[in-house]
């Protein structure tokens, strides 16, 4: 099952000896994905490649992971050093807060590093304090945030969008207002509130998919289904592909966060099982080609 070439467009590294990550360095806190004590330890590129050794992993893209908020570009600098030494990661998505008036300067700082591709500012708003990433709703509709997002747009960078499904209409507006920005939805819309929310999530995915500049990473399914099986995640995988199409969807691991719930092999083998009836070209798109296109790797 390891023959399919894989680009993993969503993984994380952290070095707790060298860098500061508040959510890890300052102790475990309530989160959308439960108790993460098991991963609250240094996770380096050697660890990631060891976890992935049974898969035909050819490239990977690193996503920001709650690095020191006083020095967001420090994460990109550190990761570029890792890439220069080890060959991974091939793409780097950093952090910026678009509400800050000097965000353009930060973007320029990120762009000094060859593997930098874009920004993720997680926009999840939830009434459950453990699940919320922002302290107010509809931030993307504020003039300050929009002005900052224009700085990303004019630099030709991509935007990784993490949110909850009930926010998708808000971000359909954003996608339509910035049609030249490649937006990449994270974690299949991050449905973490149980099966009763499936239908609302499904409809919202179709809503967001109306914007042709939005693609979807099918990942993070363990965060809302801690004891998942390939059959329990199948409806989410199939509905995501139905909404976005084979050409705008891609599989990803979310490792090591999803290591809380399964192995690297279990994730990729589940995706392979679910797509066993797909054509060679469709599988190539989902496992490899789309990630190469959207992240320019």
From Swiss-Prot:
The keyword Hydrolase does not apply. It comes from the Bacteria. Disulfide bonds: none annotated. One of its GO terms (molecular function) is hydrolase activity. It holds the Pfam family Amidohydro_2. Keywords: Plasmid. Belongs to the metallo-dependent hydrolases superfamily. PANTHER family: AMIDOHYDROLASE, BLL3371 PROTEIN. This is Uncharacterized protein y4mH. It comes from Sinorhizobium fredii (strain NBRC 101917 / NGR234).
